[in-house]
Curated annotation (Swiss-Prot):
Protein name per its UniProtKB record: Redox-sensing transcriptional repressor Rex
Gene Ontology BP terms: negative regulation of DNA-templated transcription; response to redox state
GO MF annotation, one: DNA binding
Summary of subunit composition and partner proteins: Homodimer.
Keyword 4Fe-4S applies: no
Gene: rex
DNA-binding region: 17-56
Keywords: Cytoplasm, DNA-binding, NAD, Repressor, Transcription, Transcription regulation
Pfam families noted in UniProt: CoA_binding, Put_DNA-bind_N
Gene Ontology CC terms: cytoplasm
Physiological role: Modulates transcription in response to changes in cellular NADH/NAD(+) redox state.
Species of the source: Clostridium acetobutylicum (strain ATCC 824 / DSM 792 / JCM 1419 / IAM 19013 / LMG 5710 / NBRC 13948 / NRRL B-527 / VKM B-1787 / 2291 / W)
Gene3D superfamilies: NAD(P)-binding Rossmann-like Domain, Winged helix-like DNA-binding domain superfamily/Winged helix DNA-binding domain
This protein's record includes keyword Transcription: yes
Residues bound to NAD(+): G91, A92, G93, N94, I95, G96
Length: 214
């Protein structure tokens, strides 16, 4: 049986961190590393690391550790970084522009094809050589172009409408920055980034720390 088919969501959530640290090790010309050494760098227990990496195959060798290059390549493959995803951004405000300007976007395999907005002052603006288009034209664009991922950076009141349009046009991946839970078919994958919820989580944790000090 292919172990990759049984990777849990918890492991998937940890994969980007493995990717980041393995990239750093490669840049430092590190050829191999033990689970104990990786544990000290990444913050997971050595046992957890061994369990996680066992999902990908038999990469560790007793007395040798992990081959950093091989493991990095496999993590990249699991994360889908060996592919290129056609991507659009809907909403060219502060968050949308920040994402469009992210220098590693293309390197990670996300090819930004278009940006859309409703604001006439933003339409025609170029961000990283990608022109902001009128959102009224998004339907026609999607009918002519195969897009894999839609990045939603619009106010919550407009998010579901935008979601419905891109899903109707066979966009199966959504990165949602709008502070609302979207309704989508089962075959559409939504990754929510609710900034306010993250900030409130931090606030709650700080409050607990402060209580323990009182």
């Amino acid at each position: 049986m292919d172990k990759k088919k049984n990777i849990s969501m918890a492991v998937i959530r940890r994969l980007p961190k493995y990717h980041r640290y393995l990239e750093e090790l490669l840049k430092s010309d590190v050829d191999r590393i033990s689970s104990k050494e990786l544990s000290e760098k990444i913050g997971f227990t050595a046992s957890q690391i061994r369990q996680d990496l066992n999902c990908f195959g038999d990469f560790g060798q007793q007395g040798y550790g992990y081959n950093v290059k091989d493991l990095s390549r496999e993590v990249d493959n699991i994360l889908g970084l060996t592919k290129m995803y056609n991507t659009i951004i809907i909403g060219a405000g502060n968050i949308g522009q920040a994402i469009a300007n992210y220098i590693n976007f293309q390197k990670m395999g996300f090819d930004l094809k278009a940006i859309f907005d409703i604001n006439p002052k933003l339409i025609g603006l170029k961000i990283q050589d990608v022109e902001v288009r009128d959102v009224d034209n998004i339907d026609g664009f999607l009918q002519k172009n195969k897009i894999d991922i839609g990045i939603i950076c619009v106010p919550s009141k407009n998010a579901q409408k935008v979601c419905d349009i891109i899903v109707k046009n066979n966009v199966n991946g959504i990165w949602n920055f709008a502070p609302v839970d979207l309704m989508t078919p089962e075959n559409v994958i939504v990754e929510n980034v609710h900034l306010s919820e993250s900030l409130l989580t931090l606030s709650c944790l700080l409050q607990e720390v402060n209580k323990s000090r009182d």
